[in-house]
């Protein structure tokens, strides 16, 4: 009872005393709350500068045509800079109100010339290969499939941030191109922490991006910048964009035409007629799995979300592995691969790793093999690439036990591995439009060839027309005189020499010259 009376008396004194500051009684704003408030002011100012929230939310459809350059960072024919420069042309029409998308994209670089049209209507969609004249259904089609492309308009980025306002935080000030920026962050629904840089003078969005672990450059940022804003109705919209990745520019484009709320006719969202109809790929890629394709020869399929495969051979006292794929956003693919390999061939050390070429998605997973004490066998171009990648300082990538890599390169464009039961031959079939030096792995007894990027068969059983790298690959196979019955690939399913020839015949009969 005495305790209760004491508490009541204390409350009365607090309320009555004129000498106790009100701030003691009021809840103090916490650091996260203050950070949110400052970030929210920056975002609100940016939305106002771009036309105001009402005008931004009134965007129901847009038509964007852009033209520019693409830079093949760590995907060029050689490992050294400058990177190969290609071209891109794209028309993107999006009607979010009606769930409609038309994307017409042409790109050309490193021997590949692609022309793809995509049409989405609600939950149905098709991809049209304009050179091969094939039509493929899109599983789980939605306007959100093009969310990344839709963000080419800054108002979309700002509205997404507003819709996640409780996650806004103030990060500080920065400078881009000599101009002061106010920098805030927001957490997207996919848990990606996005950073927005707002011009301190104009309040226009300069840049947005996020940090990630790059298998080549280490700690990096994927970012998109906007410039040359212009007025379109009530809106402020950019004249172009620059996309950054792996420590540098990978695309520069000019917005040659941009229209808002024209309500395109339904007839716009119709693909070409008369194309060969193919079956849809699986809606969800199957998990990585090992298949025995010959005695002591295995293919591990389904890495990188179903896009990459690995070959491995169990010799008498060791294992030879071909390829160490890794995503641009480092995802421990070699950890998965090693676990599968060791479960399939327990007790044998992984002595050799053959890397076909220096591109990041094929060689970026080398670190885990270095930790195993594996000797890497590859080309001089890839050796240079690996040494630079190993030297990259990173707090996000796995630490290398030693930056002294054990790398052996081919002599006279050939290397042979063998014991009394197994024979594996490695050939450099470069120069190729895709890579100056590029290896294929041949198993003479099994009549199996394993290659990367030179012949890509889609899972649904079809072949696109041959691109320049495929034509060069076919010519080199004829010169080598290898007796091949099955062609396995880093990308896609196994193929036959007959399918390779058919792919080349399609190219000769196509409009792509």
PLM region spans:
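N-terminal mature ectodomain segment of secretory-pathway/periplasmic proteins
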Residues: 34, 41-134, 167-172, 328
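Gly/Pro-enriched, hydrophobic low-complexity segments
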Residues: 26, 177-273, 439-444, 451-452, ...
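Flexible, processing/modification-adjacent segments and terminal tails
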Residues: 28, 33-41, 48, 119-194, ...
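C-terminal segment of classical bacterial N-terminal signal peptides
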Residues: 14-24
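Zn-dependent metallo-beta-lactamase
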Residues: 252-315
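Active-site metal-binding motif and surrounding structural segment of the metallo-beta-lactamase
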Residues: 331-377, 479-485
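Conserved beta-strand hairpin/beta-sheet module of binuclear metal-dependent hydrolase folds
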Residues: 291-341, 438-457
């Amino acid at each position: 009872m005495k305790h209760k009376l004491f508490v009541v008396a204390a409350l009365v004194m607090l309320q009555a005393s004129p000498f106790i500051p009100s701030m003691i009684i009021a809840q103090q704003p916490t650091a996260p709350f203050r950070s949110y408030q400052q970030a929210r002011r920056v975002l609100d100012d940016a939305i106002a500068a771009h036309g105001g929230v009402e005008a931004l939310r009134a965007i129901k459809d847009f038509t964007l045509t852009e033209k520019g350059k693409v830079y093949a960072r760590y995907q060029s024919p050689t490992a050294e800079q400058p990177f190969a420069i290609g071209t891109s042309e794209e028309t993107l029409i999006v009607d979010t109100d009606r769930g409609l998308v038309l994307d017409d994209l042409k790109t050309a670089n490193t021997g590949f010339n692609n022309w793809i049209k995509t049409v989405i209507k609600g939950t149905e969609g098709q991809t049209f290969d304009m050179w091969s004249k094939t039509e493929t259904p899109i599983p789980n089609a939605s306007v959100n499939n093009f969310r990344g492309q839709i963000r080419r308009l800054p108002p979309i980025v700002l509205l997404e941030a507003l819709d996640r306002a409780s996650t806004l935080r103030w990060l500080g000030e920065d400078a881009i191109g000599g101009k002061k920026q106010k920098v805030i962050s927001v957490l997207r629904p996919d848990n990606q922490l996005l950073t927005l840089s707002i011009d301190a003078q104009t309040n226009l969005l300069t840049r947005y991006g996020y940090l990630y672990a790059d298998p080549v450059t280490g700690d990096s940022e994927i970012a998109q910048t906007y410039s040359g804003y212009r007025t379109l109705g009530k809106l402020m919209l950019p004249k172009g964009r620059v996309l950054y990745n792996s420590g540098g520019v990978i695309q520069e484009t000019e917005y040659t035409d941009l229209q808002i709320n024209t309500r395109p006719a339904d007839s716009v969202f119709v693909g070409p007629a008369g194309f060969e109809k193919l079956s849809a790929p699986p809606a969800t890629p199957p998990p990585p799995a090992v298949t025995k394709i010959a005695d002591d020869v295995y293919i591990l399929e389904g890495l990188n979300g179903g896009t990459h495969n690995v070959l491995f051979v169990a010799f008498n006292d060791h294992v030879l592995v071909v390829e160490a794929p890794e995503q641009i956003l480092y995802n421990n693919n070699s950890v998965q691969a090693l676990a599968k390999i060791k479960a399939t061939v327990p007790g044998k050390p992984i002595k050799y790793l053959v890397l076909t070429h220096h591109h990041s998605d094929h060689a970026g997973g080398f670190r885990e093999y270095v930790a195993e004490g594996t000797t890497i066998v590859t080309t001089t171009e890839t050796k240079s690439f690996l040494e630079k990648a190993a030297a990259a300082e990173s707090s996000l990538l796995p630490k290398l036990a030693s930056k002294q890599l054990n790398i052996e390169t081919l002599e006279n464009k050939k290397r042979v591995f063998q014991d009394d039961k197994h024979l594996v031959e490695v050939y450099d079939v470069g120069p190729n439009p895709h890579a100056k030096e590029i290896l294929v792995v041949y198993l003479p007894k099994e009549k199996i060839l394993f290659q990367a990027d030179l012949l890509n068969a889609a899972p649904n059983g079809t072949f696109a027309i041959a691109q320049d790298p495929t034509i060069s690959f076919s010519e080199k196979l004829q010169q080598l005189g290898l007796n091949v019955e099955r062609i396995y690939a880093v990308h896609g399913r196994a193929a036959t020499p007959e399918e390779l020839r058919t792919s080349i015949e399609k190219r000769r009969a196509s409009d792509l010259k």
